[in-house]
Amino acid sequence: MAGGGSDLSTRGLNGGVSQVANEMNHLPAHSQSLQRLFTEDQDVDEGLVYDTVFKHFKRHKLEISNAIKKTFPFLEGLRDRELITNKMFEDSEDSCRNLVPVQRVVYNVLSELEKTFNLSVLEALFSEVNMQEYPDLIHIYKSFKNAIQDKLSFQESDRKEREERPDIKLSLKQGEVPESPEARKESDQACGKMDTVDIANNSTLGKPKRKRRKKKGHGWSRMGTRTQKNNQQNDNSKADGQLVSSEKKANMNLKDLSKIRGRKRGKPGTHFTQSDRAPQKRVRSRASRKHKDETVDFQAPLLPVTCGGVKGILHKEKLEQGTLAKCIQTEDGKWFTPMEFEIKGGYARSKNWRLSVRCGGWPLRRLMEEGSLPNPPRIYYRNKKRILKSQNNSSVDPCMRNLDECEVCRDGGELFCCDTCSRVFHEDCHIPPVESEKTPWNCIFCRMKESPGSQQCCQESEVLERQMCPEEQLKCEFLLLKVYCCSESSFFAKIPYYYYIREACQGLKEPMWLDKIKKRLNEHGYPQVEGFVQDMRLIFQNHRASYKYKDFGQMGLRLEAEFEKDFKEVFAIQETNGNS
């Protein structure tokens, strides 16, 4: 967070500010359009510039973030130009005050800018103020300019090559006679071959090799010389003879193309080109169909399925119940869900059973798209008939609330619905993890309601000394889940950044975070309630001790206050003046 002068001095640049100023003299003025930001040519294709700089920006976000040592004036400039919102600006500043490294904050901002990238992003990034404040941006700016120039040079080289090549149709135009069907057919074949040679000269597997392209270009020039000589020899002939000779020359030139290429299609060493790829794809497609089983009746209620070397029978009716229904029966009589069948087949890493599991050689997703197979809902409702009564006595399906939102993380995905209330959870977001095999399954909110409502008030010291029996375990799990439901919990879920900073972590006790407590709790690693409460409070103690600014840390204070309030309510702790 040092000032601009100290940043320049620490860089160890020869000449210091004067060298930076000298570099700045060669940079474009901020008022110039981005089309001329990296090139002096006004006629450059702006689409080409955009595509090139976007890819370069995407690949060099890490270098850019490393060049920016402090947030001012980088973040302020983005906010003033309305490239980031005030909320993003404030969140970024808060993260820095919370000792999150500046480079990490800048990288996150660049990642957001990438999603809505436009050319004004680079105008702001390479503004005169930023270039003076962050000298390391100068060489990054030059890398953008070099990327543009290389792209333009490559395009210009290709354009000149095309101009130097003879026009295959020239001999036909000189004769001013319409093509016969045979000549047109041969001409089309020649054009296809010419395009193949052209593309092969320009790239090999998409990587340009200019030396090779130049060598090929010489071959085309020799052919052009021969064509011109042939044309000169026929200039003195009569009109009728010229018409005949022009057609013959066209056929001759078309046949010569295969000789110039030097290789026949299909032999080893042939370049992969756009002309070659199309028929190859069709051949592969036809070949792949040979492995499909055309005898399978996809409309049948039972379908044979495979995954790797495992075979089974898929029951459509069971699949309609949801992705967690055991709808596939293997040869040994065991039942599996689609995901379990995928794992048994050796495709656990795929995590996409719709593609891993096949029927008649086709992935199940293809059958679902064609309507031959039902697409099961992402949420598995064990009891679809359950209906709650609202205040106006109208029937309300409880699963209509938050169908696509986990109660804890507020995100979508594969969700599990409680059989008593309308809440849905990810399997691992719920504490303890959802028991998918248990029917009916009740979430922890419903289980807490079922527990005895009236409790005798007691001192906190008495609560902390309790053994972790099932009832106390349930209460601790509920407390932790309530913390995860708070938006502030995301910062404390993983190990905080300040544990990696030597100056910040000095004097701190054992590193502690929510996921670590969650793992211990799920493994029944706390013999007493005291151990759980101590770990929770340790998170907030370490957070307070790591503050750089006393007026900051509202995020941790709010979460701590919420936990203490819930702790007293759940365990019916009696308030005392000396209670912390």
From Swiss-Prot:
Identify the GO cellular component terms for this protein.
Answer: nucleus
User: Where along the chain is composition biased (Basic residues)?
Assistant: 207-219, 280-290
Q: Which Pfam families match?
A: Bromodomain, HSR, PHD, SAND
Q: Where is the signal peptide?
A: none
Record domain Bromo: where: 467-570
Give the transmembrane ranges: none
The UniProt regions of compositional bias labelled Polar residues, in chain numbering, are 224-236
Under Gene3D superfamilies, the record lists: Bromodomain-like, SAND domain-like, Zinc/RING finger domain, C3HC4 (zinc finger)
SAND domain residues: 293-374
Keyword Phosphoprotein included in the entry's annotation: yes
ZnF (PHD-type) residues = 403-449
Residue numbers spanned by region Disordered:
155-293
Phosphoserine: residues bearing it: S180
Q: Which residues form the HSR domain?
A: 33-149
Q: Which CDD domains match?
A: Bromo_SP100C_like, PHD_SP110_140
Quote the InterPro entries the UniProt record gives.
Bromodomain, Bromodomain-like_sf, HSR_dom, SAND-like_dom_sf, SAND_dom, Sp110/Sp140/Sp140L-like, Sp140_Bromo, Zinc_finger_PHD-type_CS
A molecular function (GO) held by this record is: DNA-binding transcription factor activity, RNA polymerase II-specific
Q: What is this protein called?
A: Nuclear body protein SP140-like protein
Cite the record's Basic and acidic residues compositional bias ranges: 156-170
Q: Where is this cross-link: Glycyl lysine isopeptide (Lys-Gly) (interchain with G-Cter in SUMO2)?
A: K169, K292
Keyword list, A-Z: Bromodomain, DNA-binding, Isopeptide bond, Metal-binding, Phosphoprotein, Ubl conjugation, Zinc, Zinc-finger
Instruction: Give GO BP annotations, semicolon-separated.
Output: regulation of transcription by RNA polymerase II
